Amino acid sequence: MVASKKALPIVTTGDEAATAANNGVFIAIKEPNADIQLIAIGGYQLQSCLKAAKLLQRESVKCEVVALLEPGRFRVPRDETEAEYCHDKVMIDLMIAPAPLRIVVSHTGEEVITGVLRRLDLGTEKTTFMGYKNQGGTLNLDGMLKVNGQSERDIESVAKKMLSTNK
């Protein structure tokens, strides 16, 4: 379990939190027919994604934000035991809407999470993984997010680049 060192805003109701704990995912901003989907793994990363979504929405970009609590439930299972725990493709598609573009912002290294979330990967042109780069351990929260390329402005910049490349 990873827990934030600082208090974070409450973004769910009690019922939503229970469902999220059961399913390993929470849709923080639902946007039918989203232009881009931001998937956050980690509380600080979720806050950055929510802020980035607001910036993108100001420019008429339809943006969905997903909080992934248990990335392992979305992996390709390695055996029958994992298959009982992991969601199948049908369930994944029901819980996480298909999207034309995705950005995954994770508190873990991007290489590792890319492998774990292969089933959510739309390919190198349509999915970007933004992971922790092991920088800024003594910085404040905003400094740590910035130095690791996970601030709301960093996410917004990557999203704009992806949107312009994939027109």
Give residue ranges: language-model regions.
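Thiamine diphosphate
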Residues: V2-K167
